[in-house]
């Protein structure tokens, strides 16, 4: 399922954010590529639930909430988010890329993934996907994108 999310983000969501997608043909295309139908349906369901933030079905996120708090993770969350992942989330909060609200959306979306433990690289993708899809997080998305993809350009030799 996670591979499908990344594939969709790279090939459809990020590049064609304003284009309507036919889910039946998308499902067939993904199946033809080799993804399992169950994983396809799970990934599309995960994205549909995330899109609730975009359609304002769920109360909108306040992008200005900038209070830093310490998040106590549940046992299930700690199993899925290892120490590196939890540290990265805190790091993004300290950089003011994540707010309290977006942090909670990200954790909630991670808990919906059908994986046992998330690694740091996968977490970065999830954070990008969530910030891209939550209204009012455009600036945070661009900050994270620059941090992740332009980091090497900023190193002084």
From Swiss-Prot:
Coiled-coil residues are none
* Pfam families named among the record's database cross-references: DUF494
| InterPro entries membership | Smg
Taxonomically, the superkingdom here is Bacteria
Q: Which family does the record claim for this protein?
A: Belongs to the Smg family.
Record-given protein name:
Protein Smg
> What organism, scientifically named, is this protein from?
Buchnera aphidicola subsp. Acyrthosiphon pisum (strain APS) (Acyrthosiphon pisum symbiotic bacterium)
